[in-house]
Amino acid sequence: MSIVNKPAATSATKGKVLGKGLTIDRIYTTAGKHPYDEVTWERRDVVQTNWKSGEVIFEQKGVEYPDFWSVNASTIVTTKYFRGAVGQENREWSLKQVIDRVVLTYTKAGKEYGYFASDTDAEVFEHELTWMLMHQVFSFNSPVWFNVGTTAPQQVSACFILSVDDTMDSILNWYREEGMIFKGGSGAGLNLSRIRSAKELLKSGGTASGPVSFMRGADASAGTIKSGGATRRAAKMVVLDVDHPDIEEFIETKVREEDKIRALRDAGFDMDLGGKDIISVQYQNANNSVRVSDKFMKAYENGEQFGLVARASGEVIESVDAKALFRKLAEAAWACADPGIQYDDTINDWHTNPETGRINASNPCSEYMSLDNSSCNLASLNLMKFLKADGSFDVKNFVKATELIITSMDISICFADFPTEAIGRTTADYRQLGIGFANLGALLMASGLAYDSDGGRALAGAITSLMTGTSYRRSAELAGIVGAYNGFARNAAGHTRVMRKHQAATHAAKAQTTLDSDVWSEAKKEWDKGIEIGEKNGWRNAQASVLAPTGTIGLMMDCDTTGIEPDLALVKFKKLVGGGSMQIVNQTIPMTLRKLGYAEETVEAIVEYIAANGNVVDAPGLKTEHYDIFDCAMGARSISAMGHVKMMAACQSFLSGAISKTVNLPADASVEEIEEVYYEGWKLGLKALAVYRDNCKVGQPLSEGKGANKGTDSNTAAADSADSAHPVATRKRLPKSRPSRTTSFSVGGAEGYMTAGTYADGALGEVFLKLGKQGSTLAGVMDAFSIAISIGLQYGVPLETFVEKFSNLRFEPAGMTDDADIRMAQSMMDYIFRRLALDYLPYESRSAMGLYTATERQRALDTGEYTPDENTSTAPVAAAPKVVDTPKAPAARAAAPAAVKIEAAPAANNSTAGVGSSMELFEKMSGVKSDAPLCMTCGVKMRMAGSCFVCEGCGNTSGCS
């Protein structure tokens, strides 16, 4: 940013130290041994391509990472967070360098500002922070990785709230401030309700423009900065109070624009969110939210009129039917997912600084809600790192980790830069922090708890309460050492009142299982202790916690799920070392099945079924009462809308801020359902809510339907169509003498024989099946079927196609088999084609369909990775993959370890053709299209993270983290 301001040095930042500094205990590290020396490091080549075009968009060779970091995580960190120009000496090349520049900056500032009791404590702080970042226990938000320790301004905050008044100077300054924040890759939100409506008069006697008119200018500015090369799409939030006279126009803005997008798309224009033609449509760069009051919601309940208030005079200038207005809000959200809703009285009832001013707005993702002209820096814990081997939650280490993280976050405010003087001043005076978590969905599944269950909600609430209670307790301790935040004295009564509300909610909570009871017990202790210390010292921070979407940083930590979200789907898309990709079953699933008491044989069968079908419905051996544990955000068994809302409500009372989360609804959801979600959100005490009905957006890739051939010569298209309508195939007959193998089998007690003949190169060319007595109907049908399959193979139909079509067909006989590789079969056809796949398809092709030998499955259960079983596979042997040495580091980096050999991954195969992300894999397996946008950098389909979208290929996000 070109304009930056550090907070003024005050007693709350740099000045006198009130008490002895912190004593830092070791959690994970060993005295006398640096964390880097405890792990194995390897060098990798990071090459990133645009998946759709094949263009190489990034390449850096010989980068250094711990061997347990995934390819995806290392790619994202290398492309997003390594500083310096690629190919230059100042370019970072190791994760060590990235962590060191951040951690050493924090440690130096902590010593300078009096946070530590001794140099030894500072060293322990440095080592523990390094260990946790290296082991993906937590991560700071993206601006920390972008800026800290570099020559750039030390911006650490991802979330900003601005303000605008009813003057032209203020409105034009809003455009400028927002633009500077977007330039730095962050997001901002503000409330436009102070601006006079288009129904009011100016002092000169003319009619006011109204806030919706000024939104056009801000939207165009954001779109221009995005097009000018910002690190990601501009993230912005626009809020309008429900009593504003222009509220109906505000609600309908995006609905009208979606109609335009639909018309332009059907005419053949490129209306993807990154498309060249989308810029002609307005209001596409912001999330819109309506701020509703309790007064309005009660009018809605009672079917009463509600007054719209003039901004200048404060008089009611129009009355509307509250039910009709709320219905219009739900209809707009049904049509285009905007606007969301924010509950004003609930937000301000939990406000710790009421004497300073009201909370009027939020950041773009809606998790940070605080004073105007303020900011918040975020960090998120990876909850799966606290799941112990015995299945319990590691309360002790979670508390210690939270203490350390919240301390480091507060230290960052001491040296941080800000985009405006007003934001710098407010942040220095109130020191808002936003600690949160990711991987909740994975933790619940691994613990055998359904996301939409009392047990799941209880554990989520307990962890949230423990996190926030510990953070505020440490904040109170810091206040005794380096002083309370400057605004505390003015707001002492209000802050203490909110602390007691959190405490009361924690004590009122009831444990549901032994898993959450220990967490609740510790949370109660933390709140009790924190309030006792806070009433003596005050608190260092006005806010401590939020639940952010954790888009990019969630991928950096190798999280299966983001923020508070459930798992997207049970089958994922995984990048492999050296290139290529494969389809894998979520690694949490085998762990969950074992915890539920299933035998290894059944675990293997269920995992194999999920790999092929993408869901657990009718999985062999899985009890129906366990189905809900594996429910996901999308798919055959998706979590209900109210399941999402109730999970948010379970956590909301234990957060300083709010929750970035979108409530997903199926495409056939009604307006009434959305109306119910918005109403129940208010009743359950949420602060904000957004909904997303599948396929409600039409700004998506132009691939099918009208306009797909825009610009194509009609004669050429017709000729191509005619050619494709009459394909010419040549039959490749088998030689007179050919190798074959006969397999005897039994499925559900029914026996049969299969003879498979091959070409000289080992490729399958014919199949003969012997079932039933000679002359029987069954025998005749199977003979005819064998001939059809054999002729298809000889005319070039891929075996993969037959396997995909015939495996998992269900009919009798079905059940146990006598084949160790295929323990359960849904039918004879299911067994036959899975056996053919194991015998005649290369490993890469069958692994993409989730088909493995018994040896391969056992190895995966032991090591977490599928590798080919060369001894049992009889498929044609392809050329062995090359072993590649990554280039040596430059001489100036002589301290780096020797390069390890990385085996190149198999090439992409037919089964993963057309798939570049987990979202696209879900679409292929389910047959359901998503309208998620394509990533503007690498071309793959993004997935939802909170109320934003994130690209799991390169880490780009439309949000703040």
Where are these regions (language model features)?
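Short cysteine-rich clusters marking metal-coordination/redox-active sites
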Residues: 935-938, 951-954
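Short Cys/His-rich micro-motifs in 6-15 aa windows
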Residues: 955-961
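Extended catalytic cores of very large enzyme megasubunits
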Residues: 1-790, 794, 803, 820-822, ...
